[in-house]
Regions:
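Conserved G1/Walker A P-loop phosphate-binding module
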Residues: 2-186, 192-200
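C-terminal-of-GTPase-core extension/linker across diverse P-loop GTPases
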Residues: 23, 29-68, 73, 78, ...
């Protein structure tokens, strides 16, 4: 008699680690152990991802349009389609049952002179990151967004699980990329250059690195980090996105305490797509979260184009403004005349490296 030995799959091993993390109470004594478990899980997720990519398959394809893209992420039947319709009038199909949206439906929110693409995505379910319910295809769309709008309903359930599904595919919300770099070596082990203030033990840093098959390297850590930051760095395919939460169906009975608990995941907008309550406030919060910068162009005659501002992002300079208009303007640039609420001087001469802000009015003066 022969017995077939079934080896655990990568997904099986990931689930085992997830269960162990859930069972382990987090404290100072277990912090290092949990960090290593997370590192092992992240490495296995990378392996699973590479296997799935090599297998091919069709996915969703959505061209980016407008000045920024917002992806709506949430469980089925929380009212994402209704919310998109309330903001954009896109005609996304609505129903009182799960999985009404089976494809990505884009709409355009026109707000304060900006055109913001809103993506109504199919609802994700538990284990979406492993492929359940076409989850990996949905989550791949999210990676290219400028803002993630997490949508829940009056029951306010499962937000932590949704955020975890996003993290599993390398989407990290409301965190900044840490200043870490690495130079690989052939010998010498792992040498760490870090600030004195860093409390993460060197042994733990080295153990996490070794989980990602790094045994010889110079690792430069230039600010305070935790094990999650290190794992994200070694993983290498992580995107960092801002996010906020929309609690839909707020016109129905709900528990305010549960909704307040969502504050730990980001800013909250309480809305009702069916009655319109809070929809305008949600639009403003989306606009603010995107950190868009509208620059109004003024020609030599003094006419200002308030209808079609140039929409850029925070940190934009006069150089970026010129580059977005035309390369030729950048070459022939002499100076710019800026009118801004920030300055007491109404028409101030500025150069290419001057930072512009939302609402600034600018005239570009060329050499010829």
């Amino acid at each position: 008699m022969s017995f077939e030995i079934k080896l655990p799959t990568i997904e099986d091993r990931i689930k085992e680690i997830e269960q162990e993390i859930k069972k382990t109470k987090y404290n100072k004594a277990t912090e290092s152990h949990i960090g290593l478990l997370k590192a092992k899980m992240a490495r296995l997720q990378l392996e699973a991802e590479s296997h799935k990519k090599s297998g091919g398959g069709s996915g969703f394809s959505v061209p980016k349009t407008g000045d920024a893209t917002v992806a709506l992420v949430g469980y089925p039947n929380v009212g994402k389609s209704s919310l998109v319709n309330a903001m954009t009038h896109s005609g996304s199909e609505v129903g009182n049952f799960a999985f009404t949206t089976l494809r990505v439906i884009p709409g355009i929110l026109k707000y304060k002179g900006c055109q913001i693409q809103i993506l109504d995505l199919p609802g994700i379910i538990e284990n979406a990151s492993s492929g359940s319910g076409r989850g990996r295809e949905v989550l791949a769309i999210v990676r290219n967004a400028d803002l993630v709008l997490l949508v829940t309903d009056n029951e306010a359930k499962g937000m932590d699980k949704i955020i975890e599904e996003l993290r599993k595919v390398g989407i990290v919300l409301n965190r900044k990329r840490k200043n870490i770099s690495m130079k690989r070596a052939n010998t010498g082990g792992i040498r760490i250059r870090k600030p004195k203030s860093l409390t993460l033990p060197e042994e733990q840093i080295k153990a996490i690195a070794k989980e990602f098959k790094i045994t010889n390297a110079e690792l430069y850590i230039r600010e305070s980090v935790d094990s999650d930051d290190l794992i994200d760095f070694f993983r290498g395919n992580v995107v960092y996105l801002p996010s906020m939460i929309a609690v839909n169906k707020i016109d129905l009975p709900h528990d305010e305490t549960k909704i307040r608990e969502l504050n730990s995941f980001g800013k909250i907008a309480e809305v009702s797509a069916s009655t319109g309550k809070g929809v305008e406030e949600l639009k403003e919060m989306i606009y603010e979260s995107l950190s868009l910068v509208r620059v109004f162009l003024r020609d030599k005659s003094g006419k200002i184009d308030y209808e079609r501002p140039l929409v850029l992002t925070e940190g934009t300079t006069v150089r970026d403004v010129c580059r977005n208009i035309s390369r030729e303007m950048l070459v022939s640039f002499k100076y710019a005349i800026l009118r801004s609420d920030r300055s007491k001087v109404n028409d101030m001469r500025v150069g290419l490296e001057y930072s512009v802000a939302d609402g600034d009015i600018i005239t570009i003066v060329s050499r010829n």
